[in-house]
């Protein structure tokens, strides 16, 4: 990765480019054109709101990550959520209600949040929450989904509410995807991607990056396939070891160096997709972006956490506001510590720091 790479500028330019291209392609679609024009204006208003808070000494991140359910219809190999008991098919946890999420999204819009990533579990299992998100058209909601529940009814909701942007999980080719997510998954999700492309729905892809699939998913053939299916963004997310014996699947320094060079090449080429690496791109943003520096995570029960891979919390959104959560004791201590500061090698800065984080929570 070139030393002068500006991740924030790249993402902003990429989103603006996608909106511009989508506008050009949607001149015969008044519904989509109206949304894109409205969102472009809303993004400017959100930036102004964040600037006003900054003038008062309060930093507002433009991103949130919200895990809206702990249930999932798949049992993927090496799933971090299941291995850490964050995914619960019995649905015994006291999840935030649809009304709770509506309030949180309202607050996010008021303080200037522009993007809210919806995850799970499988977020398509919480249609009521998706309907709440759809009403906040000034926020773009990338929905990280396994892609198997995109029924006609769900696609109709997305088609009518273009601020919901599906990000479909795919692990590489058919063999690699089905090996992790179950037989037949690849054919189902690629068919659903084709259906979204036919409807002109904006969507992307998410790849869990491992030592086994890195060559495939960064190769020309795979990326050309994603473009042909209509994907406009590709997220590369480092595999976090969930099960004993899978440590060798986690990208090391060699893989991260390779990915950085490959993304540098791709980002310099004229392309219809934008590329995001997590957490690798953080090393070009003056350290880890968690705990409100660039984003924070809300778990399905309302806990405000530094990031999805740091499941510790001392504040719950069921009982407090987003603004208050940003100044929680944990987040404040973490931002003042050296755990987030400075550049890191690309590996998750907080993974494996359970004792330090627990101490900051007073546990």
Language model region names:
Residues 72, 173, 310-313:
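A generic "binding-loop/recognition-motif" signal
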Residues 80-83, 154, 181, 308, ...:
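Short, flexible helix/strand-to-coil boundary loops that buttress conserved ligand/catalytic motifs
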Residues 84-88, 173-175, 241-244:
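A short, flexible beta-alpha/helix-coil linker loop
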